[in-house]
Design a protein with these regions (language model features):
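A short glycine-/small-residue-rich loop at the edge of a beta-strand within enzyme catalytic domains
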Residues: 49, 84-91, 95, 125-126
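Active-site nucleophilic cysteine motif
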Residues: 58, 89-104
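A broad, low-specificity signal for short, low-complexity segments enriched in glycine/proline
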Residues: 71-75, 93-99, 132-134
């Protein structure tokens, strides 16, 4: 297959439709939208500002709370159960981004998952080892990407992974 790689840069996310589907503000089976996640994540320090500023505060809070870990002895991780992940304080990309998405929705910021695969940085080499997910939130009419689990794995790139996503992915 030929894959066109394109880095997603802050402020250049895909344009959102004028009417945002309600699903991007609604709870799901494993992501409540009733204030519980927000309280667990930031306590009484509710983020303020515009959507980007509030999402950035949530991004930092999730990164501070969670550790990327997939222990074989604990079967709870990887399901995207946001409350479980908040309490366990570890998990994979699905767990990190479930918390972020739920907290964004608690603040009335539309947010969604983007599922796909990480691909090797060098074209034509390596293998795809498994799925990865990212989160996107709506700001200024555009879907902005975040990768909090990669920020946790690569602290030197923490600032980059808020608003930017590498070209090394297929979604």
């Amino acid at each position: 297959y030929l894959v066109e790689r394109r880095e997603l840069l802050a402020g250049q996310g895909e344009a959102a439709p004028e009417k945002i589907p309600e699903i991007h503000l609604a709870p799901s089976k494993l992501i409540p939208v009733d204030g519980t996640l927000l309280r667990k994540l930031v306590g009484d320090k509710t983020p303020e500002g515009d959507a980007t500023e509030m999402a950035h505060a949530l991004y930092n809070a999730v990164d501070g709370l969670m550790k990327y870990d997939k222990p074989e002895a604990n079967a709870g991780w990887g399901r995207g159960d946001a409350l479980w992940a908040c309490d366990a304080r570890f998990g994979n990309c699905t767990d990190f981004h479930s918390i972020f998405i739920g907290a964004c929705r608690d603040l009335k910021i539309p947010a969604k998952f983007e599922m796909g695969f990480p691909i090797p940085e060098k074209t034509g080499s390596g293998e795809v080892g498994g799925y990865h997910c990212w989160a996107k939130f709506l700001s200024n009419g555009r879907w902005e990407g975040v990768d909090i689990s990669e920020a946790d794995n690569n602290p030197n790139l923490k600032d980059y992974y808020f608003g930017n996503l590498t070209a090394d992915r297929v979604t």
